C-alpha cells in the first residue's frame, strides 16, 4: 500500500519529445519512490502526474527543470491535482 501525501500535475515544455524524456521521467520517479504516469502531448509538451511525499515531489520538479541529456526545458508548470485512485507504480502512457 502506498501513502501519498499529495499529487501534482506537471507540464514540461521545450525540446522534450524525441529525447527519451518519458523513460527518464519514469526512471527518476521510481528512484524517488513516486507513482503516477507520464505522456507526450500533441503540442510537443510532456505531461506527468506524480504522487508521493512532498520532498520527493519537490526533488522531481527540480529534475524536470534540467531533464535528461538532449532535452532543452523551457518551462515547467505545476498544479496540485486529485487522484481518482492511488497509482501503485509509475507508467508511461500514450
UniProtKB/Swiss-Prot annotation:
One of its GO terms (molecular function) is acylphosphatase activity. Its EC number is 3.6.1.7. It comes from the Bacteria. The keyword Hydrolase applies. The keyword Transferase does not apply. Gene3D superfamilies: 3.30.70.100. Residues 71-85 have a biased composition (Polar residues). Coiled coil: none annotated. Keywords: Hydrolase. This is Acylphosphatase. It comes from Rhizobium johnstonii (strain DSM 114642 / LMG 32736 / 3841) (Rhizobium leguminosarum bv. viciae).
